[in-house]
Amino acid sequence: MPLLNSLATPYAEALLQVTEARGESETVADQCKQLLAIWNDSEDFRDAMVSPVLEPDAKKQALKALVGEDVTPSVFNLLKVLADRQRLIAFDAVMLRYLELYREQQGITLAQVRSAQSLTEDQQAALSKKVQAMAGTNKVDIDLSVDPSLIGGFVVSLGSQVIDASLSGQVRRLGLALAKAS
């Protein structure tokens, strides 16, 4: 990943500078999250965008049809530059790096929450309050994901701190305790 990071950083920094100047950093951060969701959810789209067989113009047309009206000109221009330079392979790295730089700049803490199943809005709100209390700030960006291997409960990662409130974690800890006792 260091190679992709070194490739992604200049693009992400340039996007951040442009969006700051235009006063659209927060909007673009939200758009980056949406684009990452599309990228991660659609293997066919991802494969087409990184394919060396597909011409850059065809990739740009596909991008315009998919997201052209839904993103700011700053983001769409970045996508066109990545397509022209055959750098769409680093698309997710650029988006993630932008979000990282944006959070650093805004003093926002990232909390990653994995749950065994999708959380309701009430559960998300309650969890958000707990995570904000743990972080000691209201500026927390929560990244929710579903991980059925947890069986039940959730795991919160906040910086170097990990809170494992999952059923699989409890079973693992119980197994370790039993192994020590015998």
Curated annotation (Swiss-Prot):
Q: How does it sit in the membrane?
A: Peripheral membrane protein
* SUPFAM superfamilies found in the cross-reference section: N-terminal domain of the delta subunit of the F1F0-ATP synthase
Show the GO MF annotations. Answer: proton-transporting ATP synthase activity, rotational mechanism
**Superkingdom, natural source:** Bacteria
Record's GO cellular component terms: plasma membrane-derived thylakoid membrane; proton-transporting ATP synthase complex
Q: Which UniProt keywords apply?
A: ATP synthesis, CF(1), Hydrogen ion transport, Ion transport, Membrane, Thylakoid, Transport
Q: Does the keyword Hydrolase apply?
A: no
Q: Where is it located?
A: Cellular thylakoid membrane
Q: Which family is this sequence assigned to?
A: Belongs to the ATPase delta chain family.
Describe its function: F(1)F(0) ATP synthase produces ATP from ADP in the presence of a proton or sodium gradient. F-type ATPases consist of two structural domains, F(1) containing the extramembraneous catalytic core and F(0) containing the membrane proton channel, linked together by a central stalk and a peripheral stalk. During catalysis, ATP synthesis in the catalytic domain of F(1) is coupled via a rotary mechanism of the central stalk subunits to proton translocation. This protein is part of the stalk that links CF(0) to CF(1). It either transmits conformational changes from CF(0) to CF(1) or is implicated in proton conduction.
Q: Name the NCBIfam families on file.
A: ATP_synt_delta (TIGR01145)
Q: Report quaternary structure and partners.
A: F-type ATPases have 2 components, F(1) - the catalytic core - and F(0) - the membrane proton channel. F(1) has five subunits: alpha(3), beta(3), gamma(1), delta(1), epsilon(1). CF(0) has four main subunits: a(1), b(1), b'(1) and c(10-14). The alpha and beta chains form an alternating ring which encloses part of the gamma chain. F(1) is attached to F(0) by a central stalk formed by the gamma and epsilon chains, while a peripheral stalk is formed by the delta, b and b' chains.
PANTHER family attached to this UniProt entry: ATP SYNTHASE DELTA CHAIN
> What is the protein's name according to its record?
ATP synthase subunit delta
Q: Which organism's genome codes for this protein?
A: Synechococcus sp. (strain CC9605)
